[in-house]
């Protein structure tokens, strides 16, 4: 995977050149919204966590409006194991009974969210932690998931997994105007106050649509989307995605990621990228340079 040179390897002249190279991107994206789905190794490796927080703060300071949506799969699995439960997934979605929902809300809305907020704030940002239950800004209903290769209407029960029905953007707009950085745990609320676990990629994609984001960036543990031979696919169209799903190249956790990315691209998000979160400062590379680090999803 591509690596950046260590800071000590870069001369002062080169540092100045790098800053100057970023200027066109800073001008282009000034006051634009970038929705970032934060997950994978970038959330567990201490150095990568620090790089991510610094990237987000820098993006805010140069005039962009970053909005962070995070996952927390490994942390959820750790706590489930402590209480004697085993995680189960169907078509990339976590099966969520009542006990699992308690664990998910505790981990995502508490432990993980507050750690991200704290890291960003340590580097000079003004991060605010939220779940979709705050101001009921992410409304959801129970997801009825269609079984694979089954007749229409033949659904599988995945418990308290939610499908987004409405996102109210006013809370995020209010925070942006105050120079705050929203950090969102993917938990929604039902009409009767039910709590729903929503896939973080789905939340990020829908939020990018509603906010009319300039970019949606999804961090992964791979260089991007790979073909069967393990080669990076730098650009994908809907037709190519259908072929990759049909032949089994795309499966599991990559399915909701690809689906959300494609929906966002089709619904007005100008640029959608699935990038390698294991690369230091991957956000700056993707947004403020020509050095892409992943796969771009095209709407056509």
Swiss-Prot record:
Read off the Pfam families from this record.
AA_kinase (PF00696)
May I ask which residue range the UniProt record assigns to the signal sequence? none
Reactions listed under catalytic activity = N-acetyl-L-glutamate + ATP = N-acetyl-L-glutamyl 5-phosphate + ADP
Residues the entry annotates as binding substrate: 72-73, 94, 197
Q: Cellular location of this protein?
A: Cytoplasm
Its annotated pathway? Answer: Amino-acid biosynthesis; L-arginine biosynthesis; N(2)-acetyl-L-ornithine from L-glutamate: step 2/4
MF annotations from Gene Ontology: acetylglutamate kinase activity; ATP binding
Q: Return the InterPro entries for the record.
A: AceGlu_kinase-like_sf, AcgluKinase_fam, ArgB, Asp/Glu/Uridylate_kinase, Glu/AcGlu_kinase, NAGK-C
The protein's superkingdom reads Bacteria
Q: Tell me the CDD domains matching this sequence.
A: AAK_NAGK-C
Could you say which EC number(s) this protein's record lists? 2.7.2.8
Q: Name one GO biological process term.
A: arginine biosynthetic process via ornithine
Q: Annotated site (Transition state stabilizer), which positions?
A: 37, 257
Principal place of residence:
cytoplasm
Q: Which UniProt keywords apply?
A: Amino-acid biosynthesis, Arginine biosynthesis, ATP-binding, Cytoplasm, Kinase, Nucleotide-binding, Transferase
Report the enzyme's class at the first EC level: transferase
The UniProt entry, under Gene3D superfamilies, shows:
Acetylglutamate kinase-like
Per the record, its GO cellular-component terms are: cytoplasm
Q: What does this protein do?
A: Catalyzes the ATP-dependent phosphorylation of N-acetyl-L-glutamate.
Q: What NCBIfam families does this protein map onto?
A: argB (TIGR00761)
Q: What does the sequence similarity comment in the record state about its family?
A: Belongs to the acetylglutamate kinase family. ArgB subfamily.
HAMAP family named in the record: ArgB
Q: Which PANTHER family match?
A: N-ACETYLGLUTAMATE SYNTHASE, N-ACETYLGLUTAMATE SYNTHASE, MITOCHONDRIAL
The protein's name is Acetylglutamate kinase
Species for this entry: Aromatoleum aromaticum (strain DSM 19018 / LMG 30748 / EbN1)
Task: Tell me the name of the encoding gene.
Answer: argB
């Amino acid at each position: 995977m591509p690596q950046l040179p260590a800071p000590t390897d870069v001369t002062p002249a080169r540092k100045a050149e790098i800053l100057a190279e970023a200027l066109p991107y800073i001008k282009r994206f000034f006051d634009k919204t970038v929705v970032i789905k934060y997950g994978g190794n970038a959330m567990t490796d201490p150095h990568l966590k620090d790089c991510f927080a610094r990237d987000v703060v820098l993006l805010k300071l140069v005039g962009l409006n970053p909005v962070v949506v995070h996952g927390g799969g490994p942390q959820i699995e750790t706590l489930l194991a402590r209480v004697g439960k085993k995680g189960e997934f169907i078509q990339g979605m976590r099966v969520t009974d009542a006990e699992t929902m308690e664990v998910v809300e505790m981990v995502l809305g508490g432990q993980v969210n507050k750690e991200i907020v704290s890291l960003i704030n340590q580097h000079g940002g003004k991060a605010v932690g939220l779940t979709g239950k705050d101001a009921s800004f992410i409304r959801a209903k129970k997801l009825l998931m269609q079984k694979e290769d089954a007749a229409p209407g033949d659904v599988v029960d995945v418990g308290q997994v939610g499908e987004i029905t409405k996102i109210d953007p006013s809370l995020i707009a209010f925070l942006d105007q105050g120079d705050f950085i929203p950090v969102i745990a993917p938990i929604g609320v039902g009409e009767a106050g039910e709590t729903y676990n929503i896939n973080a990629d789905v939340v990020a994609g829908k939020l990018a649509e509603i906010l009319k984001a300039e970019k949606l960036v999804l961090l992964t543990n791979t260089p991007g989307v790979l073909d069967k031979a393990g080669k990076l696919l730098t650009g994908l169209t809907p037709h190519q995605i259908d072929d990759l799903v049909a032949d089994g190249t795309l499966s599991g956790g990559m399915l909701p990621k690809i689906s959300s990315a494609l929906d966002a691209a089709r619904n007005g998000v100008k640029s959608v990228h699935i990038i390698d979160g294991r690369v230091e400062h991957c956000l700056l590379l993707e947004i403020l340079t020509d050095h892409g680090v992943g796969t771009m999803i095209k709407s056509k």
